[in-house]
Amino acid sequence: MSYGYDDESKRKRRYIVITISSVLLISMVVAVTVGVSLNKHDGDSKGKAEVNASVKAVKDVCAPTDYRKTCEDTLIKNGKNTTDPMELVKTAFNVTMKQITDAAKKSQTIMELQKDSRTRMALDQCKELMDYALDELSNSFEELGKFEFHLLDEALINLRIWLSAAISHEETCLEGFQGTQGNAGETMKKALKTAIELTHNGLAIISEMSNFVGQMQIPGLNSRRLLAEGFPSWVDQRGRKLLQAAAAYSDVKPDIVVAQDGSGQYKTINEALQFVPKKRNTTFVVHIKAGLYKEYVQVNKTMSHLVFIGDGPDKTIISGNKNYKDGITTYRTATVAIVGNYFIAKNIGFENTAGAIKHQAVAVRVQSDESIFFNCRFDGYQDTLYTHSHRQFFRDCTISGTIDFLFGDAAAVFQNCTLLVRKPLPNQACPITAHGRKDPRESTGFVFQGCTIAGEPDYLAVKETSKAYLGRPWKEYSRTIIMNTFIPDFVQPQGWQPWLGDFGLKTLFYSEVQNTGPGSALANRVTWAGIKTLSEEDILKFTPAQYIQGDDWIPGKGVPYTTGLLAGNPAAATTTPSVSAAAPGFSTFTDTSGADSIAPTASPAASPESSISMAYTGTASPESSIKVSSSTETASPESSFTEASTASPESSIMVASTESSGSFFSMFT
């Protein structure tokens, strides 16, 4: 069907109004995630007709949400009877900002009254996470002033990532009270109830917008454009030269050199970080020479575009041993915590040496959006790598551990990585992954491409009593896709392990595609309702280009990168061949259609230290809803080992329909 110029122009203007109004509403909604309870007060009547019109406007805005009453009550009580969505948002935003300040003061007061050290840490952790949510709100609100129609697709994708991260912040706040004394945890849970509901509502509205825009198939909405050389615009000329170099620091002098032998400017990483420029928009490179660095490192939110380059994952090692058993929250046990966006690490080892007996002990926690890890090693036992939130890419890395050693709520892709199972405590099971998606609309999940699952010799000696599984659902909508990966015989025929009873078995999203090895057979896999069989079209949506918009920010970083499907997948991509050399212990794979399924050898050897630049073509596609077939549920595999469990999420949330809500969009026509 064709439209005249006036109709088309009007239609585009309407899309813009819809988007701006909705996005602003979401910004307001997410601000509330810092734990604000909005003041309750009775407003003077402005006239029955005016009130009715305002109530209708609020109801239309709240139509797609799961917690509709919370949405409506919040806007009606603070909306000054306006029918303008923009004014509703501005009013609520101003009220929320004031309440954020009040809530921060209140949390500080509660913390000062606590005697239990774990409770005090949990409250301080909540305060930190609230601060992150508020910062993200402010940045997103400012960016709305730069809104352009052709950037609509990018805006919606980023907002879904941001709202997913906000949900992670809320959940992590409450998780910190596990094992605490007193009622501080229940107090915070009640304080955050409305905020949590409003955040899920915000994600519902943005998801509705994404579905609507996707249906329209409007040309010109693929927004993020690479420069002619194939680099994102934020990578400056010096950074491009550095990241292209065969040896990452051979022809470009790093900004800072850390060396324990005194040959650099600083002997510790933390000393060096004091001199990293704040809120920098260009790359800042820290070369960390060989050595065992026993220190706890935090790349805070002001350290964006930071690059760590080591001398090899077995030579440059950052080591710690904080753990849950010694009274520290899981979130705070990380040896290295990375919050600043656009972080890159190459040729570095990270470890937590607390041991299996100390339970949760994180080596690295990653909250950095568009972060990259190449030729790195993450060693630990339980909860080794905490991929907390945002978009992350891991290439040629090794992750070792015992229980849930790869967990979190990030949208993370792992290419050509080794997942190395270690010996746990006697008779403990070893589920490898535990993804923590709380809402089905979150654009998060784990994707493994061309990886290898292997076991250390000590584990192989006890594999009959310490059974390994691909993963288990940490949260109700846990999502993990494993494709073109070598699965050994010690992975149980059931494949997946339940968390507790039937928790999440109907709502999780697990799929296995074109895997190899003696443990890859699907005949005896669990048949929970959440186990998915993906079509060829669906599989493409979980490749890096589409799933984490990787074509926008990974190419040109000196990191091997396969944009689409690997060889051996149905309809394997042919756009971007991976020209990198294979890491020792792995088979080379390319994007060549028609090749046999890859079967990388099970050696966990590290990849070469040299950085390799890649050719790149292609553009990112927006994430879209995926329809999958599901099988019937059967009895669960053997019971999960005893471990601190997560509270069951609230009532099930229906997956957003691809059909737009008529009442929601009618108010903008």
Swiss-Prot record:
Molecular function in Gene Ontology: enzyme inhibitor activity; pectinesterase activity
Expression (tissue specificity): Expressed in flower buds.
EC number(s) reported in the record: 3.1.1.11
Subcellular location: Membrane
Main location: membrane
GO CC annotation terms, alphabetical: membrane
Cysteine pairings via disulfide bonds: C397-C417
UniProt cross-references to InterPro entries, sorted A to Z: Invertase/methylesterase_inhib, Pectin_lyas_fold, Pectin_lyase_fold/virulence, Pectinesterase_cat, Pectinesterase_inhib_dom
Comp. bias (Low complexity): 629-652
CDD domains: PMEI-like_3
GO biological process: cell wall modification; pectin catabolic process
Recorded superkingdom: Eukaryota
Binding residue positions for substrate: T330, Q360, R472, W474
Family stated for the protein in its record: In the N-terminal section; belongs to the PMEI family. In the C-terminal section; belongs to the pectinesterase family.
General function of this protein: Acts in the modification of cell walls via demethylesterification of cell wall pectin.
Protein name per its UniProtKB record: Probable pectinesterase/pectinesterase inhibitor 21
Species name: Arabidopsis thaliana (Mouse-ear cress)
